[in-house]
Every structure is written in C-alpha cells, then in structure tokens.
Amino acid sequence: MNKIKPGRKIPGRVDPCRIVARLKNSGTLVNLAGNYDYLSSGYYLSQDRENSGHIIRPTCKEMLDAYVPPLFLEKARLAGILVPEYYISNGYFESPVIVDPINPFTLKGRVILKSGKARTIAKSLTRNYTYAICCQEIPACGKIKYFRSVLGWSVSPKYRELSNIVWEVFDIPLARVRVICTANGECLLSDISPLFIEDLGVREIRYVQEHVSWDN
C-alpha cells in the first residue's frame, strides 16, 4: 500500500491538523483524530464538542466501547458480528491465545502461541496480577490479520463489509482492525487500535476527501 512520504505533495492532501470535519451525507461532525483512547487528545476533542451540544462521531462512550477489549467484543457479539471465544482472567490463560490488557497503564497486548513464557507474560500484562486481562482463543489453524478501516471502507475488497460494520456499530472513523481468519474462511473481529490521518495511503486520503468537508 502506498503511503505519503515526507515532502511528497499530493493534490488536496488532508491536513492532519484539521481533524474535525463534517460528513457530507449527514452534516454530522466527525472526529478524525485517529486515536480514541481514554483521555487522549481525540477523547477530549469529542468531549468538548459534546459539552457544547454538538453531535459528533464517535462520542466518548463509543470510544470506551471500542477501546476496552471485553466491551468491544461483547458489543460486537450483541450486534451479531462473529468474534472469537474470550474470557477475562487475572493471570491464567491457555495458548494459543491473544492477551489484551484491560488496565489503563498497559496498551499493547501479546499473541501467545506456546505456553513456555505464559506465566512471565501474564505477570507483566496484569502488573503483577493486579489488573485483569482479556484472553481471546485462537482457533486451530487460525491466522491473525490486520486491515485499515477508513470511514467504513477498506482498500482491500476482502475487508470492506467488515470495515463498514466497524463504522456503523462502533462509530470509529479511523482504525487498524485486527481479525482472526479461521480455516473455513470466517473473519472473527478481534480488536481495533489507532490509525492516524498522516499514516493513510493515497487512496485512503482520497476516500476521506470524498466523504467529508471542512467548515473553513
């Protein structure tokens, strides 16, 4: 996928500083910060607009639903989206598994395919067994894949339907989406993480330009 490199000029390139736009189809404000983690600048941006009485996507509540692993998985499941089997633990898990921290001090999860270092990893991710972790079971022959979701669209046709679901269910405009692809061809929605405007490829930027407008 082509990315815009520093110094390369693209006609009509999106300015990463202009992160609040309006959806052309509805006029609703959209937060294009890319990182919607709790207490991030993107979180405060939506909070300020909400406190001013504006409707903006995503809301602070929607950010929490999307960025807290068990909330994300349960919301997806209730919406009829395929997700992996998962459980919450304070240290114990069986491989192969994806382990995501729930605590606000540890952001990066781990993929554990063998049980050799499971105890050490569990101790680290739980901050010495203080915080819980969300454990997603990896099915036999399952493969972990990633795609980028931009306003419900993906460069890859394979993931466009799932990208649209992420947008419609979670209201997250920009996201790096993790899925587990099973042996029978199913894609299990697993996680979403930040994706910034400045990291978008040329086709992704053009898609943004086609679907949003700026007030100035």
Language model features: what each stretch is:
Residues D171-I172, C181-N216:
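C-terminal active-site "lid" helix and adjoining low-complexity regulatory extension at the edge
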Residues V83, L174-R176, L189:
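Hydrophobic residues on conserved beta-strands that form the core of alpha/beta folds
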Residues V99, V177-V179, S190:
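Active-site flanking residues adjacent to catalytic metal/cofactor-binding acidic residues
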Residues A132-I138, I144, I172-N184:
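A short glycine-rich, hydrophobically flanked beta-strand micro-motif that places a catalytic Asp/Glu
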Residues M1-N164, Q209-N216:
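Active-site nucleotide/adenylate-binding loops and adjacent lid/helix of ATP-dependent enzymes
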Residues E161-F170, L174-R176:
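A conserved acidic, glycine/proline-rich C-terminal tail/linker
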